[in-house]
């Protein structure tokens, strides 16, 4: 997911997308125990997307606190 796509999301969308990606990562980790992944870069990309979204969520929280 691109940074501009993440920046366009609001807080609720970010929270739901983070939860969705974390569930997907957990599923992939489970299936990796059974059978090795064909593309190991999927894990790295998912973790990076989750980190980007959490960073954006923190930025939104800080903006809300400074505006309040």
Swiss-Prot record:
UniProt keyword annotation of Ribonucleoprotein present: yes
Keywords in alphabetical order: Ribonucleoprotein, Ribosomal protein
Record-annotated disulphide pairs: none
GO annotation terms (biological process): translation
GO CC field: ribonucleoprotein complex; ribosome
Highest taxon, organism lineage: Bacteria
InterPro entries hit by this protein: Ribosomal_uL29, Ribosomal_uL29_CS, Ribosomal_uL29_sf
Pfam family, any one: Ribosomal_L29
A molecular function (GO) term: structural constituent of ribosome
Gene3D superfamilies noted in UniProt: 1.10.287.310
NCBIfam families: L29
Sequence similarity: Belongs to the universal ribosomal protein uL29 family.
Protein name: Large ribosomal subunit protein uL29
Organism whose genome encodes this protein: Chlorobaculum tepidum (strain ATCC 49652 / DSM 12025 / NBRC 103806 / TLS)
Lineage: Bacteria, Pseudomonadati, Chlorobiota, Chlorobiia, Chlorobiales
């Amino acid at each position: 997911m691109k940074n501009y796509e993440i920046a366009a999301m609001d807080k609720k969308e970010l929270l739901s997308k983070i939860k969705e990606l974390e569930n997907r990562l957990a599923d992939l980790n489970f299936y990796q125990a059974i059978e090795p992944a064909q593309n190991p870069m999927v894990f790295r990309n998912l973790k990076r997307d989750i980190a980007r979204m959490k960073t954006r969520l923190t930025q939104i929280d800080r903006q809300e606190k400074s505006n309040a």
